[in-house]
């Protein structure tokens, strides 16, 4: 299925690119989230008319993401208290949602989908540097300190 991208999509293309994707990916992800439209003559004309507006919107989102990245890197270490054993092994784990909630409580909005934990959830106490992807082009690092609850 050929679609016109309305947003920059990782590993697929940029705004305005006409790409061929599997029908299920288009129907279940790209079209419902407003990230693409079906590539037919009428949609091509509508897209070309709205191109400047969409590019301005993308630039504004990028600027907002850069601003949030600066705020996140300016944060001191975000402290998360969790129950732990004697050796520093946590009972449970600290995951994306916990980190996102702690950063949001510290004053910077962060969604759990923006937190990247490539090695899985944090299962020990200590200091960690966690990458957050705020935009396809903007990444930041937040310092997370996991401490044992008293």
Swiss-Prot record:
An example molecular function term from Gene Ontology annotations: structural constituent of ribosome
SUPFAM superfamilies: L9 N-domain-like, Ribosomal protein L9 C-domain
UniProt key word Ribosomal protein: yes
GO biological process: translation
A cellular component term, taken from the record's GO annotations: ribonucleoprotein complex
Domain of life: Bacteria
InterPro entries xrefs: Ribosomal_bL9, Ribosomal_bL9/RNase_H1_N, Ribosomal_bL9_bac/chp, Ribosomal_bL9_C, Ribosomal_bL9_C_sf, Ribosomal_bL9_N, Ribosomal_bL9_N_sf
Cross-referenced Pfam families: Ribosomal_L9_C, Ribosomal_L9_N
Keywords assigned by UniProt, alphabetized: Ribonucleoprotein, Ribosomal protein, RNA-binding, rRNA-binding
Function: Binds to the 23S rRNA.
Family: Belongs to the bacterial ribosomal protein bL9 family.
Protein name: Large ribosomal subunit protein bL9
Species whose genome carries this gene: Shewanella baltica (strain OS155 / ATCC BAA-1091)
Gene name in the database record: rplI
């Amino acid at each position: 299925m050929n679609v016109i991208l309305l947003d920059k999509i990782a590993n697929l293309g940029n705004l305005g690119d006409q790409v061929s994707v599997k029908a299920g990916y288009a129907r279940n992800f790209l079209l419902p989230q407003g990230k693409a439209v079906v590539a037919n003559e009428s949609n091509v004309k509508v897209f070309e008319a709205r191109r400047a507006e969409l590019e301005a919107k993308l630039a504004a989102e990028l600027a907002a993401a850069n601003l949030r990245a600066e705020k996140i890197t300016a944060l001191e270490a975000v402290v998360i208290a969790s129950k732990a054993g004697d050796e520093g092994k946590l009972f449970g784990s600290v995951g994306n949602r916990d980190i996102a909630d702690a950063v949001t409580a510290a004053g910077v909005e962060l969604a759990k989908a923006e937190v990247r934990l490539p090695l899985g959830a944090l299962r020990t106490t200590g200091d960690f540097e966690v990458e957050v992807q705020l935009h396809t082009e903007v990444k930041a690092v937040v310092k997370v300190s996991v401490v044992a609850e008293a």
